[in-house]
Amino acid sequence: MLLITRRSGESVRIPESALVAGKVVPAAPARRKGPAASYEELARVAARAWQPVERERLGEWELRAAAGFTRRANSVLPIGDPGVPLDDALSLVRQWYAARELPAYVQTATGAAGTQELLCAELEARGWVREVTAEMWIGALAPIGDLPDPGPDRTVVLAREADEAWLGRYQRKGVSEVALEVLGSGPSVWFATVPGAEPGIPAAIGRCVIDGRWAGFAAVEVDPSLRRQGLATTVMTALARRALSEGASAAWLQVEADNAGARALYARMGFAAHHAYHHYLGPTATDGGTSAGADEHVGRLPGGEIRGGATERYRSV
């Protein structure tokens, strides 16, 4: 069997016996200008880069759960029609999450063509509370890869899995097996580590998921004692070059609206906001959830995310 990856990121299998002819096609030249993208394309790319361990369809909606590890992996992605009236859909959503001892969240978006301003209004009218807002930024990938090398004293190690050192810098406590499964999910996942002065304690880390033309950056975190030294840029440049070598040409990331340092860094790299996205908490979810940040553990189950103070974060989700 041959595994073929389409430009959309979808993988298909073709029996070798069905292949008549083939040739090596080089990667398309990397674009230096910013990409064009629809909300739906970006929403689906972002969802593939941070996959839940459990999912179920409700019409065209997707219900996602991952033992409370981040709202993104424990919320409904409501793209399209749920197939039932909205009140019935929301009731089913609350029941589904209650059965898993999780609060019910719906992830929506605003600010671009095809986003969900009407759904946001309908949720608010029914008592759902907008708990967290962040932004999706996009930009051309090549300019990031074109940034100068940082020098021989800044080695970036790329790996397919997050090792103990990477997890030690990742701003979480008690990362569970479920969390590791979510972190490792995606079409082509890379973890970057800049070794620190002490063995086993990285100076900086990052994560990138390559999916067709897109490279998604996340978990870019720097030791606070080493901030303002370009380490975040170093990490992203190394990951961008890896993504370019796999044929990607566009980049995306997610950042909190009040994270001024991250926004300034990404703007210098050529990123710009595409749309905002929000997590709405259902009115019957009385068991948990936290309003402390955009990427916290939710619900009562152990082994999730608790924001600490050991690193400087360059993205929120």
Q: Which sequence ranges carry the predicted segments?
A:
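Conserved catalytic-core motifs of GNAT/GCN5-like acyltransferases
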Residues: 129-139, 254, 267, 272-285
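Acyl-donor-binding surface of acyltransferase catalytic domains
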Residues: 86-165, 280-281
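Conserved acetyl-CoA-binding loop-helix of GNAT-fold acetyltransferases
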Residues: 86-94, 219-222, 228-245, 264, ...
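Conserved active-site alpha-helix within GNAT-family acetyltransferase domains
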Residues: 113-128, 233, 257-276
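Conserved beta-strand-loop-alpha-helix junction that forms the acyl-donor binding cleft
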Residues: 108-115, 224, 253-263, 280-285
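Flexible, substrate/cofactor-facing loop regions flanked by secondary structure
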Residues: 148-219
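Conserved GNAT acetyl-CoA-binding A-motif
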Residues: 100-109, 243-254
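N-terminal charged segments
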Residues: 3-98, 304, 309, 317
